[in-house]
From Swiss-Prot:
The lineage of its organism: Bacteria, Bacillati, Actinomycetota, Actinomycetes, Micrococcales. It comes from Arthrobacter globiformis. InterPro entries: FAD-dep_OxRdtase, FAD/NAD-bd_sf, FAO_M, GCST_C, GCV_T_N, GcvT/YgfZ/DmdA, GcvT/YgfZ_C, TrmE/GcvT_dom1. This is Dimethylglycine oxidase. Keywords: FAD, Flavoprotein, Nucleotide-binding, Oxidoreductase. PANTHER family: AMINOMETHYLTRANSFERASE, SARCOSINE DEHYDROGENASE.
């Protein structure tokens, strides 16, 4: 067998052992798995996990992980018994809000290919006789959910992979990570150094300690979560012949933050209905492997009965039969939580070859392991990992204070019904643009992303609702789609289309790539030919080696060796920094290149609208005519005495520019434009109007409209790919592909009734079959109809009808050519 890289996996829990198995399946054979605990019971979260697997999730990625986990554990058998008991899952509603949310969740299930159905109260009780039918309003049943035997699965995976040559070393504590030349070289243990080409930390709630060994911030917080077992329940006698047997579905009562499973004739109850209990792993004491047992392990803390008593009372109301039993034993078990609730996956930006797979629960374990194995062996995962990427957080989101507060908030809200736009109440105002004071004066309604305060609309524009033509007034929204929205956005869209508006674009990531090797780097990473004269601005894509879209960016060549990039967050930053480091280290002096994140030190105003040129001419002597600054060109100008880089581009589809200056000059630039714009009716406009105008123009948004799971032709972005270019990452994979030949294509949908507004991720049906899901959606104020985008089979044509399911209601939509607004680009080039 050919030699493969030396892999060291830290952690022999459900993720680490699954990863070893997935790597073996792909032909990698030089693998060592370490754990500080005994292999038969490592003592991490896996060892006490109750094993409930509910697959349905708002995230396509997380649902994909869960589906594969079920599939794999079902196939992992010994003596004819698998590691997954597919009893099904039942989620019940005791409030109208929860019942509506179950309808939405059923939509997610349909979108992600998971079978489920809504049950009436009577059907819930028939399926689960112990339920108190009087308080149940309905339920969601997913037959393929069930119970994972996580600890047993770990032992079978160890047995299987050991026979394939994997080395396991239990009771082995990691004391450090060896490195040389910016790359991992080994793992230090008390017994010596284990050489390694790749190290993967699957250390669970110890993950932050392992990361700290290389100076890496791993943003997870260990939190204790309560779990109890009851004494025998009389109504359960004779139902299960195994001590941990179960025949009833796993049960979730999210209105009270509770879940349930059978343990033979006893019940297991998990509760999030208590105060957050953060755990400092340094207080757990020295690890003593010889003392680990089922009831004594580092991840299992003493039970605090007083925290559980309200949950016990709620349990007896939901399941009256449990009133005849008592709490027999319980514990506070440690799990990992993160600032946004997602797992932490991928390669460290600090050290090449050091990977993490942390904050992963049993539900997603095998799916995550598969994705990580694909990433290691091929350089990409078949499942898009953007929302799980360890590099996704901004620096301000990696501080211990931020990680602690937000992770505890996620614990409190874990079962809450949260709107997609639901803002955090705290921490806020972490990052504000230089225009923030002016935004507040204008009554901005702020939402937060990446730590940035982003205005969505301005109350100062409310009076415009009485001035604008009646056809611009949007229809009344239902309660859900109406949350965190305002009709004022329509007025802001109207002013953008008919006069001029100022948009704060500061939070969008800006990178400077410079040095003699800058062009070489960008040519290899992007799909466009960037060998253009200074002043050129280019829209282009970053692809992975299989042709998946890993990002879309704009590149402005400011000089021979300096480029400004408009990127998509810290994932792009880490990608460019790593590529620049590799090129600089491996090349000659002429290959030297550096990447700087300039976002915090700069700011940007999008000045857009048919009167934008009239406005800017009042405060600048520079030539902003079509000849003076052509479409997709940049130049240095002076506006109101302030040095500015102006780029002629617009993501709202109107004449205008992105105007960049240093942060210290930002408020002066805003004030100069604002004052000069008063005769032209200038307004400040927010992200709500921006999103609507973007969709009317057919512009894609990375992370929703396209990911690594889509190629440029499927996404309708073939124009951004220059196949005549000598080389770029992903080029080989795109050979022979065309938009017309794509098996699926991103399509524009317009809602037939003109008033039903969806938000995203709703399933799309064609001829009664779920064939896609909504990627982006908004009300189109200019076109006076709701808009949605969805990937649909290539056989679906313009003019065909589809149905979008929204809270259980089917909404008819028509496949429409895009863009809906200004397809000939006359407004942009005006």
């Amino acid at each position: 067998m050919a030699s493969t890289p030396r892999i060291v996996i830290i952690g022999a829990g459900i993720v680490g052992t699954n990863l070893a198995d997935e790597l073996v399946t792909r032909g990698w054979n030089n693998i060592t798995v370490l754990d500080q605990g005994p292999l038969n019971m490592p003592g991490g979260s896996t060892s006490h996990a109750p094993g409930l697997v509910f697959q349905t999730n708002p995230s396509k990625t997380m649902a994909s992980f869960a589906k594969y986990t079920v599939e794999k554990l079902l196939s992992l058998t010994e003596d004819g018994v698998s590691c997954f008991n597919q009893v099904g899952g039942l989620e019940v509603a005791t409030t109208e809000t929860r019942l509506a949310d179950l309808k939405r969740k059923l939509g997610y299930a349909a979108a992600w290919g998971i079978e489920g159905r809504l049950l009436s109260p009577a059907e819930c009780q028939e399926l689960y006789p112990l339920l108190d039918g009087e308080n149940i309003l309905g339920g969601l049943h997913v037959p393929s959910d069930g119970l994972a035997s996580a600890a047993r699965a770990v032992q079978l995976l160890i047995k299987r992979t050991e026979s394939a040559g994997v080395t396991y070393r239990g009771s082995t504590t990691v004391t450090g990570i060896e490195q040389s030349g910016g790359r991992v070289t080994g793992v230090q243990t008390a017994d010596g150094v284990i050489p390694a080409d790749i190290v993967v930390s699957c250390a669970g709630f110890w993950g932050a300690k392992i990361g700290a060994m290389i100076g890496m911030a791993v943003p997870l917080l260990p939190l204790a979560h309560q779990y109890v077992k009851t004494t025998p329940v009389p109504a359960q006698q004779g139902r299960n012949d195994q001590p941990n047997g179960a025949r009833l579905p796993i049960l979730r009562h999210q209105d009270q933050d509770l879940y349930y499973r059978e343990h033979g004739d006893r019940y297991g109850i998990g509760s999030y209905a208590h105060r957050p209990m953060p755990v400092d792993v340094d207080t757990l004491g020295a690890y003593a492997p010889e003392t680990v047992s089922e009831h004594h392990m580092p991840s299992r803390l003493d039970f605090t009965l007083e925290d559980f008593l309200p949950a016990w009372e709620a349990t007896k109301q939901l399941l009256p039969a449990l009133a005849d039993s008592e709490i027999e034993d319980g514990f506070n078990g440690i799990f990992s939580f993160t600032p946004d609730g997602g797992p932490l996956l991928g390669e460290s930006k600090e050290l090449d070859g050091f990977y993490v797979a942390e904050a992963v629960w049993v539900t997603h374990s095998a799916g995550v392991a598969k994705a990580m194995a694909e990433l290691l062996t091929t350089g990409r995962s078949e499942t898009d990992l953007g929302e799980c990427d360890i590099t996704r957080f901004e620096d301000v989101q990696l501080t211990p204070e931020y990680v602690s507060e937000t992770s505890q908030q996620n614990f409190v809200e874990i079962y809450d019904v949260l709107h997609p736009l639901q803002p955090r109440l705290s921490p806020r105002n972490l990052r504000v643009s230089p225009f923030h004071a002016r935004h507040k004066e204008l009554g901005a309604f702020f939402l937060e992303a990446g730590g940035w305060e982003r205005p969505y609309w301005f109350e100062a524009n409310a009076a415009l609702l009485k001035e604008m033509p009646a056809e611009w007034l949007p229809p009344a929204r239902d309660a859900w789609s109406g949350m965190f929205s305002s009709p004022i956005a329509a007025a802001e869209a109207w002013k953008t289309r008919t006069a001029v508006a100022m948009y704060d674009m500061t939070p969008l990531k800006r990178l400077e790539v410079s040095g003699p090797g800058a062009l070489k780097l960008l040519q290899e990473l992007t799909t466009a030919d960037l060998a253009k004269k200074p002043g050129a601005v280019t829209y282009t894509l970053l692809l992975d080696h299989a042709g998946g879209v890993r990002s879309d960016i704009t590149v402005a060549r400011l000089s021979e060796d300096t480029f400004q990039l408009g990127a998509n967050g810290n994932i792009d930053t880490a990608y460019f920094e790593r590529a620049a480091r590799h090129q600089t280290q491996s090349g000659s002096a002429t290959d030297w290149v550096q990447v700087r994140d300039t976002t915090g030190g700069t700011c940007c105003i999008g000045l857009w609208g048919p009167l934008a040129r009239d406005l800017v001419s009042k405060v600048s002597d520079d030539d902003f005519t079509n000849d003076g600054l052509k479409y997709f060109r940049a130049k240095n100008v002076v506006i109101g005495g302030i040095p500015v880089t102006a780029m002629r581009l617009s993501y709202v589809g109107e004449l205008g520019w992105e105007l960049y200056t240093s942060a210290d000059n930002g408020q002066r630039l805003w004030d100069a434009l604002w004052q000069a714009g008063q005769p032209f009716g200038v307004i400040a406009a927010g992200r709500a109007a921006f999103s609507s105008l973007r969709l009317e123009k057919g512009y894609r948004s990375w992370g929703t409209d396209m990911t690594t799971e889509h190629d440029p032709f499927e996404a309708g972005l073939g124009f951004a790919v220059k196949m005549a270019k000598e080389s770029f990452i992903g080029k080989g994979a795109l050979e022979g592909r065309t938009e017309e030949a794509s098996a699926r294509r991103l399509r524009c949908l317009t809602i037939d009734d003109g008033r039903s507004i969806v938000l995203g991720k709703e399933p799309v049906f064609y001829k009664e079959q779920a064939v896609g899901y909504v990627t982006s959606a908004a009300y189109g104020y200019t076109v006076a109809k709701p808009i949605a985008y969805s990937y649909l089979p290539g056989t679906v044509s313009v003019g065909d009808s589809v149905d979008i399911e929204y809270f259980g209601r089917r909404i008819t939509a028509t496949v429409t050519e895009d863009p809906l607004y200004d397809p000939k680009m006359t407004r942009l080039r005006g």
